[in-house]
């Protein structure tokens, strides 16, 4: 006989981890789970601030879509630009911050910041209870799942919330946009106008 716990585990999948997100994954694909949304509303209703980290090299329309979705759930969203000396971004840290301030920074309740070191330490310093991650496709999930579990291990008080952008942005990434720009393609439908101009200057 299957007990209540077994039924709940099978509903959420992956050892219950996905009860903290707005969807579950089954062989048939992604779909919204009303019960997981209920858990979200109950457990995160007191959270006022969330961190949306990334390299944003550069910011795309997909990023902005996730930011706007996150803003509907939290009083403040801190868009945190990672400073990583091991990477060689196309845009400098200052340029990425400026582009974000010109785009995402115009959304009410959104603040732009930079960080280095452990994400959970930055979240703690900002008194943020959640980290926002965008999922474009199932292929993103394995890496994000591992990172979310590691962050939970480092600080169980910081939860990870997965948000999916509009379908039209599921294929979009900064890497693809930069490649199109380098090849002389039109990126105006993928990024804000100021970013398209900046890419044109960088890649000309």
Which residues are covered by each model-predicted region?
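Intrinsic disorder/low-complexity segments
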Residues: 2-46
């Amino acid at each position: 006989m299957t007990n209540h716990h077994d039924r709940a585990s099978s509903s959420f999948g992956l050892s219950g981890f996905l009860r903290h997100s707005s969807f579950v994954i089954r062989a048939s694909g992604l779909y919204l789970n009303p019960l997981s949304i209920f858990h979200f509303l109950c457990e995160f209703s007191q959270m006022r601030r969330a961190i949306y980290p990334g390299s944003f090299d550069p910011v795309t329309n997909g990023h902005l879509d996730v930011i706007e979705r996150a803003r509907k759930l939290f009083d403040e969203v801190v868009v945190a630009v990672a400073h990583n000396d091991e990477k060689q971004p196309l845009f400098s840290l200052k340029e990425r911050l400026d582009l974000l301030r010109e785009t995402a920074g115009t959304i009410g309740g959104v603040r732009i910041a930079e960080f280095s070191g452990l994400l959970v330490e930055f979240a703690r310093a900002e008194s943020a209870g959640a980290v926002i991650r965008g999922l474009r496709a199932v292929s993103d999930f394995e890496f994000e799942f591992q990172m979310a579990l590691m962050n939970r291990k480092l600080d169980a008080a910081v939860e990870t919330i997965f948000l999916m952008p509009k379908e039209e942005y599921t294929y979009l990434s900064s890497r693809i946009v930069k490649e199109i720009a380098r090849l002389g393609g039109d990126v105006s439908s993928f990024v804000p106008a100021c970013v398209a101009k900046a890419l044109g200057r960088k890649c000309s």
